[in-house]
Amino acid sequence: MMDFLKRFFGSSQERILKRFQKLVEEVNACDEKFSSLSDDELREKTPQLKRRYQEGESLDKLLPEAYGIVKNVCRRLAGTPVEVSGYHQQWDMVPYDVQILGGIAMHKGFITEMQTGEGKTLTAVMPLYLNALTGKPVHLVTVNDYLAQRDCEWVGSVLRWLGLTTGVLVSGIPPERRKAIYQCDVVYGTASEFGFDYLRDNSIATRKEEQVGRGFYFAIIDEVDSVLIDEARTPLIISGPGEKHNPVYFELKDKVAELVHFQREMCNHIAAEARKTLDPFLGMDVLPKDRKIMEGISEACRALWLVSKGMPLNRVLRRVREHPDLRAMVDKWDVFYHAEQNKEECLERLSSLYIVVDEHNNDFELTDKGMQQWIEKIGGAAEDFVMMDMGHEYALIEEDTTLSPEDKLNRKIAVSEKDTQRKARAHGLRQLLRAHLLMERDIDYIVRDDQIVIIDEHTGRPQAGRRFSEGLHQAIEAKEHVTIRKESQTFATVTLQNFFRLYEKLAGMTGTAITESREFKEIYNLYVLQVPTFKPCLRIDHNDAFYMTEREKYQAIVAEIISAHRSGKPILIGTESVEVSEKLSRILRQNRIHHTVLNAKNHAQEAEIIAGAGKVGAVTVATNMAGRGTDIKLDKEAVAAGGLYVIGTSRHQSRRIDRQLRGRCARLGDPGAAKFFLSFEDRLMRLFASPKLNTLIRHFRPPEGEAMSDPMFDRLIETAQKRVEGRNYTIRKHTLEYDDVMNKQRQTIYAFRNDVLHADDLFIVAREQIEHVSLALAFLILKDARADHCSLPKVEEWLSYSFPVKLDDQEIRRLGNVDAVADYIGGLLIEAFDAKFSSMLTEFTEIIGSASGAQGVCNDILRSVIISHIDEEWKVHLMDMDLLRSEVGLRSVGQKDPLIEFKNESFLLFEGLIRDIRIAIVKHLFALELSLTRSDRPDNAIPTVATAFHNHDNFRPMELTIIGEEEN
């Protein structure tokens, strides 16, 4: 029935395209109408449209004219020179109907899927122009600085011709220039540049003049799937050096390396013994039928199953897996030990290892044997694996009648410090093990100039300046014997998911989005629209070629490269890691094939390499070329030779990345072809392929070196990719659920902070904080609702120590209720505050000679005090939230939902944060002692406000310098 209705009415995509097509016709009509206008008359259309919008016309009503204007300008610019990235180019682009259609979709808030070479960059100009007419912030988000600069110079020339201003944000631009850039009508930049400016404005700026942004109205995200999906799990973090160096990584690095060495040696020994049994059968196509022989083979495969849990990449294990029958037998033991009835035997066998590595879930677990080895042979401490029960420890201290209250407090502090040290040591140990067991050099990171440089898993680019969080970076530094740097402390953080939710309107464009349409809809409320191509795609997509072993696969790839190279076709070979690209490069050198390698180690030559990749006979080996975001343009000889030939050395875990790699060829009607070569040893096949695959390869094993190619295998690959995509989607959604909790708190704190930055009278803000503290004290005093059992003595002692006020016990008891007591305490504190700052204001007025100037100085002082405590307490809160996030997962063992537990406890932490901020602010205001002095310079005095503090709590001396004018 649904199929019938779809055929009758058309799919939702078809209906939307049909509706938008009518607007395309209106745009073309406007374009023709504007052709008779002079350049000045056409430019005058921009202020006219702005006025019409201000007078109430909607952008939808203005769309046909605005898009028609852009198209007409593009036609007028044809043949004019445009300087792009230092090169002179001639403008030769006029939007096609499909580009206008894509531009309409983006204005309407769609993600437009447009194939590589279809002109997404020009398409974006139309919705950018239309939305910039509002005068509100309009941003174009790219995947790197180069594209931001290029697009601003290139298609930004259309916007500038029409009288709009454009700016580009790249790394290294100072704050004062950033502020000017944000004032432009349209701003180009990367997600990280926009995101970090948002964090700096809300966590680093101490005056409103230091804030650079002007809000979030409309954004178009180029390569939207890369930004909102691939990078969604990586938060933007502003951090600084921690207060102290954690020595645990240096202390434990050799011990952890020794434990991993024990594990490797044991697994190598087990594998070597198994190989003695299996060696005679590795060359056989069919295993013998003799029962006794098969029992021996089965036991050897059982031993290799154990090796797979200790060292999954063991060479013997990988060699045995090349034989389909032996591979099936190893996997059979895996299925056997996953069964509930065999759980005890599974645990017994795994207990013979030091560490159990779960390659599928990227995790590991130390066994009892591993712990024993750590303690007895390596010299580790038993305390490394035992956490303290703080409730029990505190109870023992309270029960000790020989201790005075002060001694009990000191004991509790000592126990708390001991617990913190144990947790830090245990955490460091786990991160060192993770670095050795799960993080691979030249895949996850490279070592350069005594530093660990992260490799972006999606683009293959080195991420200089970025560091793995939670001590993992220090652990890898220890593993690779480079300088171990201090752990960083987070000052501010936000995920890209929640950052882009700040925009009123959001749109995107990419060549591959339809496979992720569900995630775009559920998380961002964005719908994907597939835009037709301008010309039919001539790409030839060959079936995947499957090989039994990695060795056979590489032999076939080299043979294919040699064959295609003879025809003159330019060849692009896509690899998943630096390691694979360098391995393939060695093989090509051995075969004397001239080629160029583009990976994280030589990314600086990227533009030069890409420029030559489309020339006839070029061979380019590129790591994650899919994420490069740059088109490869063919010369005439390359087109005549058959166009770009794309070879994939493995399937990515995401179908979308594979589609991107295919899309690098056959752009805008050019010829081209793509083919993937796979082996059953590839990570995707090994970890996520269906068990049916083992059955198939056992029955259809081809001769050595011969490929298997069948749509059935393609479907199995797609199933494996869908399984991985589903898992990754769950992880991203899970991450977002936790960050949503943090996001609400972030918005509350940032709103409070901005109110302080923009407030004209900080005395009002200060009095509000005093009132809040007074209410909290009233609750504390009357928490039992009985004056006879209240906390009055403790509160009185604390108040007299912190503030210049003394409470009247009789008055407190007479008032009795919280509101009345709060008003009483607040009255005393506000009276003392007003007296203190009135005196200060009088003194400053005499020195400065201006009441308004003195008021400004006092406002600056109060603002500095309030902002400093918001920032300091927020940093501590971020650390507490990270700790809670890392610990709450264990609650599932007690049949509790970790997310619910996180929400409940984070709410309590946030309540405590607000209370601590207010108390710290109020205490600081009363602890402040100020003096104002003039500079000896007669022409331009600089009053210096030096603030000193009483010696209590952790207040640090601070100095403020206020620029002022000397009295004439």
UniProtKB/Swiss-Prot annotation:
ATP binds at Q99, G117, E118, G119, K120, T121, D631. Its EC number is 7.4.2.8. It catalyses: ATP + H2O + cellular proteinSide 1 = ADP + phosphate + cellular proteinSide 2. The keyword Transmembrane does not apply. Its main location: membrane. It is a peripheral membrane protein. One of its GO terms (biological process) is protein import. Pfam families: P-loop_SecA, SecA_DEAD, SecA_PP_bind, SecA_SW. GO terms for molecular function: ATP binding; protein-exporting ATPase activity. One of its GO terms (cellular component) is cell envelope Sec protein transport complex. InterPro entries: Helicase_ATP-bd, Helicase_C-like, P-loop_NTPase, SecA, SecA_CS, SecA_DEAD, SecA_motor_DEAD, SecA_preprotein_X-link_dom. Keywords: ATP-binding, Cell inner membrane, Cell membrane, Cytoplasm, Membrane, Nucleotide-binding, Protein transport, Translocase, Translocation, Transport. It is found in: Cell inner membrane; Cytoplasm. It comes from the Bacteria. Monomer and homodimer. Part of the essential Sec protein translocation apparatus which comprises SecA, SecYEG and auxiliary proteins SecDF. Other proteins may also be involved. Belongs to the SecA family. Part of the Sec protein translocase complex. Interacts with the SecYEG preprotein conducting channel. Has a central role in coupling the hydrolysis of ATP to the transfer of proteins into and across the cell membrane, serving as an ATP-driven molecular motor driving the stepwise translocation of polypeptide chains across the membrane. This is Protein translocase subunit SecA. It comes from Chlamydia muridarum (strain MoPn / Nigg). The lineage of its organism: Bacteria, Pseudomonadati, Chlamydiota, Chlamydiia, Chlamydiales.
